[in-house]
Amino acid sequence: MNDSELIFLGTGTSEGIPRVSCLTKSDKMCAVCSDSILPNSPNRRRNTSVLITKKINSQYINIIIDVGKFFYESAINIFPKNNIKTIDSILITHTHADAVGGLDDLRDWTNNLQKEINIYLRQKDFESISKSHNYLVKRNKLTGGGVAKLNFSIINKKPFILHGISFIPLPVMHGKHLEIFGYKFGNISYVSDTSYISKETENLIIGSEILIIDALRPKKTHGTHFTLEEAVEFAKKINAKKTFLTNATHDIDHNRINYQLKKENIDIKYAYDCQKIKIKL
């Protein structure tokens, strides 16, 4: 169906943009971080995350991929403007802080708007959260204020159906020793963090009309992320109709880099926080 959207809740790396260290430097100003504090700057980037909305009858289903450290700020900025109230399900790609650091903030929803939220993740990620967020798994372990009521469901590499949408896990490497998930759904393949994509996963991605791919920074290689150049090379292999780059550091000046990307002869550009795109589910 066409009555569906994807909203970029965040398009930045773990520390987000701006960096406080850049804003407080007295010697040399960081141009991107300085610009990012201006109203509506595309250089303002929170942790990489997306919201998928699908209309079923008169109701919207809201599915989020990852809730990082800046998730609550993203929700404050984006949810009211788009009349988003409840969260139906959350998919987790991995358990770094920029993907799960906002789990605790989900208490605002389960205390005030809905009874519970369903979380979908791999067994090893559930085990990790059981240690880092023990009180969210065993809710009787915490005394005091209300705790988010989360229902954890284990997924593996097999495709699964969620709210009538087919999701295909995309195993990718996030560094040499950590395999994480991207997801293919509808006409989109979403890979937020990767340094290596196998031929097997590449074959799953081929045919996507929209590719959303990690592109940390230009030129300088990184052990756990694609560079801009690596992302462009991969996008050309996939040959999607549109490619959106995400997970950017302050080395990416949004408008300048997007202007330079026009020479690549494919439709590729950095996404920005709050950006909405129509999708097919």
Identify the role of each PLM range:
Residues 1-191, 200, 258-281:
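Binuclear metal-dependent hydrolase catalytic cores
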Residues 196-281:
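Cap/insert and terminal regions of metallo-dependent hydrolase folds
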